[in-house]
Amino acid sequence: TRRLLAAVLLTALAGAAPALAQTPEAKKEEEKPKTYWEEHKLFAYIENSATFNLSGAGRGGATRGTNELRLYDFHEGYTFNMAEFSIKKDPSEKYPFGYGLVVTAGSDAQKNHSFGIFRDEEDAFPFRNTEWFDLQEAYVSGLIPVGSGLTLKAGKFATLLGYEVIESPNNLNFSRGYLFTLAIPLTHTGGLASYTFTDWFNMTAGVVLGWDDAKNVNDSVSYLGQFAFTPLKDFTASLNWVVGPEQIDARRIDENVSRDSRVYVNSHLRYVLDFVFAYTGFKNLTLALNVDYGHEQSEPFVRGLGTRQDTDATWWGWAAYAAYDWTDKLRTSVRQEFFRDAAGARTGSGIGTDLWSSTATIQYKIWKGLVGRVEYRHDQSDERVFRVRYSTPDRTTQGLLARGNSLDTISVSLYYSFF
């Protein structure tokens, strides 16, 4: 009986198998190709902020102060940071030509100028006398059908270096860290070529006029590049670099300077190696690490001190990031970083300086594109590089305002994204 039952079952299964195999699969709906205008990316936002300097509180001094070694939150008090409009189109197989245009206005835009575009060789940070608007990016691009596709770009564009970017909504924190402010450039003018070798490796390389330079201030060029890796689905890594002479030809400021000065300037290279790692494999959690190392031969600030035989400058640092989305609206982010300015060239201290910084940010999406942030930041230095307010400023032996080893700020910012 058991053998008969088993035979019946086997016969039934064998008969059903062809029927199952012949069952037609549901056809997958083909993705509709994008139109020309659908390939465009629009981005625009407005940001305002107020930063309160807690250092020296209660010691007098009601005037608006400054936050040393900061960039977009350099000024204490209210700041109209940025109004930006961006339109970009990447090259594609169907539409192989692309372009990008980013125009900005506000206090942040004033600090992003390149030489030759609203900035001259004599202009220096914090750029109080320059225009409050900027042509941040303007480029054309094209896709050449070679292998997986060779992408070419020419014009002015944002740097490949760094984890943080100019656009505030695309950062985890409101303030920019020391690596963004002191270690790397913001934009370049020149040409780039990019090629994807595999689904996990891409390379970009090109020739540019230098750091934040659109007019070529020393008749020389720099070389920019990137190795980008995606070894895992949620893990990205990149090695970025820029190398070339960046010092200004003195004849750009004084025509009476001899030609030999330019040759001397062009012989001094500046280079930066930039490593960026990011992981988003844990639900609602973003982790990132940025490491920089830079060096410049015969750095002009150190050379001008007249106290060193070795006038080279070296700087390096790291920044670690963690952000957690508690809800669709609430996010908290922390940043911890260290920056070593071995010669005091990047900080302007003139001596070896170590900087530490801890930042905590609470972000809340108030309504549609309206987002508010509250941020506390503590900066610490082994040297007195931070200004401290006094009702009657003390003077040091060098005739400088008294300074402290730490800086504490609270920032409140509000931005609205239109797209």
Residue ranges of predicted features:
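Outer-membrane beta-barrel proteins
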Residues: 17, 22-37, 84-93, 141-146, ...
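Outer-membrane beta-barrel "beta-signal"
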Residues: 364-366, 401-419
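Transmembrane beta-barrel strands of outer-membrane/channel proteins
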Residues: 44-52, 101-105, 154-156, 205-209, ...
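Residues on the lipid-exposed face of transmembrane beta-strands in outer-membrane beta-barrel proteins
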Residues: 44, 76, 80-89, 137-142, ...
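Residues that define the transmembrane beta-barrel architecture of outer-membrane proteins
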Residues: 76-83, 131-136, 185-189, 219-223, ...
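N-terminal periplasmic/intermembrane-space "pro-region" immediately following the signal or transit peptide
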Residues: 1-69, 413
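Surface-exposed coil loops of outer-membrane beta-barrel proteins
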Residues: 52, 57-75, 110-139, 143-229, ...
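Repeated loop/turn-to-beta-strand initiation elements of outer-membrane beta-barrel proteins
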Residues: 93-97, 147-152, 200-205, 233-239, ...
